[in-house]
Swiss-Prot record:
The keyword GTP-binding applies. This is Ras-related protein RABA1f. NCBIfam families: small_GTP. It comes from the Eukaryota. A motif (Effector region) lies at residues 42-50. Gene3D superfamilies: P-loop containing nucleotide triphosphate hydrolases. The keyword Chloroplast does not apply. Keywords: Cell membrane, GTP-binding, Lipoprotein, Membrane, Nucleotide-binding, Prenylation, Protein transport, Transport. Pfam families: Ras. It comes from Arabidopsis thaliana (Mouse-ear cress). A lipid is attached at residues 214-215 (S-geranylgeranyl cysteine).
Length: 217
């Protein structure tokens, strides 16, 4: 039980959702970040799945509760409960399948319809290790991210490329917005109740953060 107690020591709890077409590698991104595991035999997720991991941002412990779409995206059955309370999202496409890139606009609309307008979004081009099969250029994806005012990275869950960076960037940006908002109203950010749904502030707060931008390495 000690391990469970240790895992509960955190200053913030942020809910982050993974969205995107089936087969783009969402579950492997989740397992790579939370358990440093990758499965070549990965089957479509069935049933609700989420995992947690805590990271340090400044001198605070930020715990991420990361939700996987559980295969429901194949049936267009993702419910509003999946999105409820999310303050961050990774919108994933497969760089080798152009149709998954074409569908991100629909995913983004659904995400924004069901979440706070200021949610921190990372646009993720996964399977970047399959260079010889690339069907979506980095430039096209960057242009989309800039147009939609989101962050962007290309990742490889297989090679563990940028997976850590993508998740930690989202969590760090959420933390910065929440911290700045707390300072503006004179609150101690650490005093916010654990598990509270975090309102990530006014539109100006997040657009100012997002202008910093982020791109693939």
């Amino acid at each position: 039980m000690a391990a469970y107690r240790a895992d509960d020591e955190y200053d913030y709890l942020f809910k982050v959702v993974l969205i995107g077409d089936s087969g783009v590698g969402k579950s492997n991104l989740l397992s790579r970040f939370t358990r440093n595991e990758f499965s070549l035999e990965s089957k479509s997720t069935i049933g609700v799945e989420f995992a947690t991991r805590s990271i340090h941002v400044d001198d605070k412990i930020v715990k991420a509760q990361i939700w996987d779409t559980a295969g429901q995206e194949r049936y267009r059955a993702i419910t509003s409960a999946y999105y409820r309370g999310a303050v961050g999202a990774l919108l994933v496409y497969d760089v080798t399948r152009h149709v998954t890139f074409e569908n991100v606009e629909r995913w983004l609309k659904e995400l924004r319809d069901h979440t706070d307008a200021n949610i921190v979004i990372m646009f993720v081009g996964n399977k970047a290790d399959l260079r010889h099969l690339r069907a979506v250029s980095t430039e096209d994806a960057k242009a989309f991210a800039e147009r939609e005012n989101t962050f962007f990275m290309e990742t490889s869950a297989l090679e563990s490329m940028n997976v850590e960076n993508a998740f930690t960037e989202v969590l760090s940006q959420i933390y910065r917005v929440v911290s700045r908002k707390a300072l503006d109203i004179g609150d101690d950010p650490a005093a916010l109740p654990k598990g509270q749904t975090i309102n990530v502030g006014s539109k100006d707060d997040v657009s100012a953060v997002k202008k910093v931008g982020c791109c693939s390495n």
